[in-house]
Amino acid sequence: MRIVIQRVGHASVTIEGEVKSAIKQGYLILLGVEESDTSEDVDWLVRKVIGLRVFDDENHVMNRSIMDVNSEILVISQFTLFASYKKGNRPSWLRAAKHEISVPLYEEFCKKLSDALGKPVGTGEFGADMKVELLNDGPVTIMMDTHNKE
């Protein structure tokens, strides 16, 4: 699994002209699922996201987690995170998991994240054409990959 976490002042996702989810301060997370991903990958990412300390403390040091600041999370499915561009200029998404693998893992990630956060997590709609709007805060943008745990 691969995610891009962006610390945001606010974010929303619109589908067919209607806002599906919106958050205030927190994280916008783009989530890509690979064929070999499992529930263990979900658990690792949830622990990392919840524990990540990228919100400022009283000394303006990034020392607080999403739990510490009681913020919100919006999760958007993003198969293009697994783009391969080795050959030519048109990306290939062969590494991205098919729906029967990616949808259950996306839903599991959102549910476990919501359970850990103690409140609902905003979501997009898997496979839909979405318009995502955000105000990047910082900017703080972090990538995580369960197959490259750095």
Residue ranges and their predicted role:
Residues M1-N89, A97, P104-E150:
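N-terminal, polar/charged subdomain of small-to-medium soluble alpha/beta proteins
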Residues W93:
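Glycine-rich, phosphate-binding/catalytic loops in enzymes
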